[in-house]
Amino acid sequence: MPNASRVVIVAGEESGDHHAAELVKQLKAVYPNLKISGIGGKHLRAAGVHLISDLTRYAVTGLTEIIPFLKIFHKAFQDIKQHLSTQKPDLLILVDYPAFNLRLAKYAKKKLGLKIIYYISPQIWAWKGKRIHLIKDSIDKMAVIFPFEKTIYENAGVPVSFVGHPLVKKIASAKDKHSSRTFLGLPLDEPIIALLPGSRHSEIERHIPILVNTAKLLTLDNPKLRFVVPIAGTINPDKVKAYFSNQNLTVTFIQGQAIECMSAADFVIVASGTASLECALLEKPMCIIYKSSFLTYVAAMYFIKVKFLGLCNLLANKMMVPEFLQYDCNEIELSRYISNFHSDPNQPKSMINQLAKLKESLSSSQADCSLFDLVVAELPEKNA
C-alpha cells in the first residue's frame, strides 16, 4: 500500500489559520491518512495539524512594530526550512502572510523544488514593486479570492484560479441583528456601537485609546449609548478592558464572536482589514480606522499605489465607507462624523444600499473551482 501524501501548510495570522483549518477539515474528511504539518494557530491545531510553530500570537504589522519579534520570526523561518528539507512534502500550501511566505516560497522552490499553492494573494495590486515576478518564479498555482486578482495574474503569466471569497459563505449564515443581540445577551432596544480595534498588539495600543475617547464624546450626546467590543483570540482580554476602566461607559466585552458583535450593532467602527470586509458583507453602517507608526506611515505613502485602504472601498473603486487614517484617526473627527451620520436618515440607507450591491457582486462571481478541488488536483494519486 503506497504511503499517504505529506502536506505542509503555513498560516501566520489568525484569519489565515481559520481559513486553512477549514481546508484541512475538508481534506481530512476525504483523505484521513493525509499527513499535514506546518505553522499555524489554535484552529489548525484543533483540525489535527502537527504544528512546529505558532506565530498567530505575534500578530504585528509595520516596520517598527515587528522589531521586538524579529528573533521569534527568524527562528520560525529556520525551523520551517528544516522541516521542509526533512519532510520533503508533496505539496506546500502558503496562506496569506506575504512577508514570511514569499521568502519561504523562494527557498522552497529554488532549494527544494517543491510544488507550491499560494492561497489569498499578497496585495500586489496595492504595493508598488516587483512582487509578482517573485510569485511567477516560485508559485505553481495562485488561489485568489477576488475576481480582479485573477486578471492581474493571468496578464503576468502566473497560473491562477479564482476560488471564491471565504467570507461570503461565512456571512451568509450569520445571525441577524435581533438574534445576535439575544445570543450575546445584549438589550434589544438600546443603541449599540461595535468597536473593533484590530487583532494585532500594535493596533490595540494605537486604536483603543482613540475609540475610548470617541465613545466618551458620543455618550455625552446620548447617555443611553452602549458599546460592544469583541476581543480577538490573539489579544489578552485584560489589556483591552483596562483601557475602558473608570471611563463611565456602558461596555460589553465579548471573547471572539466579531461577526455577531457587528451584526448586533447599529453602527461599527472597525480597523482596516478582514473585519472591515466582514462588516461590509453584513451590510452594516460603518467607518474604517487605521493608525500606524510614523515610519510605517511614511513608507506606506511611498510604496502603496491605491487610493483607498478599506477592502470594500477598493472593490467598489470609490469611497463607499469613510476612512479615518493616521492623523485623521482621532476622537474629534470620528465622533463628529458618527453624530452627523445618524442625524440624517438618508445616510445610513444610502450606505446600506451600496454595501448590498457590493455583497451581490462578490456573491454572484462564479469561482473557477473550490480551494479543496484545487488542492486535491495537485496531490499525488496515492491518496485515492
Swiss-Prot record:
A GO CC term assigned to this protein in UniProt: membrane
Protein's UniProt name: Lipid-A-disaccharide synthase 1
Keywords recorded for this protein, A-Z: Glycosyltransferase, Lipid A biosynthesis, Lipid biosynthesis, Lipid metabolism, Transferase
Record has Lipid metabolism as a keyword: yes
Pfam families reported for this sequence: LpxB
Species of the source: Legionella pneumophila (strain Paris)
E.C. number: 2.4.1.182
Catalytic activity reported: a lipid X + a UDP-2-N,3-O-bis[(3R)-3-hydroxyacyl]-alpha-D-glucosamine = a lipid A disaccharide + UDP + H(+)
Family recorded in the similarity comment: Belongs to the LpxB family.
